[in-house]
């Protein structure tokens, strides 16, 4: 998760570096290590940027840790440290875990990337997994998810459910990852409801429940009857529940907070990836490299439909999810007509689709989004 705002030039550099790592994956791969043969369990650690709650970014990664422990049993001992701020505190915690003899350390926050790399240089025999990072090293791999794929599917559901033809979107910062999701949501929405539009509120914060709630209330007061968000709490879901409106959950299933309001949940799944990486250390097969996985890889999915969503809408969304998995559907693709931004400029020419490089550097709002980036 991007904890801090990244300036546009830095975003472009990040995209370039991430794509270079993807393209150079075979070259980055290191000679497989010796299989783990210690009599004691392999030690795997996870560092979290916020406290563990019942839903959200950290919850999904904690579920990944639990999946590792459940899958590998006594062969592995997992631990975690929660609520670790990015920066100096992160480096201290990561270094301490390495000194304690952990064999693999997962650091799932963008602001952990540099501290991870710094510690990794001093502990060449420890493997590091920098989740949402983009810089690799001999003992540092990176991974992220194509969250925008789930956003597109959520947009389809929202387009079917809205009655006011207005959706609201509470967003953190206008960085590429957020813009990917906002634009994909809008494209999905308008693919089934061309008259619908999206109003967005920028918070310039990732986790601020009171302001997230206020933004949701503002959007509903402006006519939005379906909401989505790219922030860190359940506040938007709670606001929709309070007002009797609908909302798309992000990160986790949030029906405990919004049992009547939830349309569906866009979730990212880390259990399979984390387990595969820990198992690779156990078997001496761990290699550095980059992964950017989506629905096809099982890293992103939608589901957990709420009670107000008709079965026909559920079936439609799940069918489109299968199309994504099979490669038959691309969120950032144009048909006979080009896709334009909300200033009228062509951003996807007719009969074409964006490359990964272009998706990673999105700096525009698609037609149908009301507002500007700042």
What are these regions (language model features)?
Residues 1-4:
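Positively charged n-region of N-terminal signal peptides that target proteins for export
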Residues 9-27:
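Bacterial N-terminal signal peptides
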Residues 30-374:
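A residue-level marker of the well-folded mature domains of exported/periplasmic proteins
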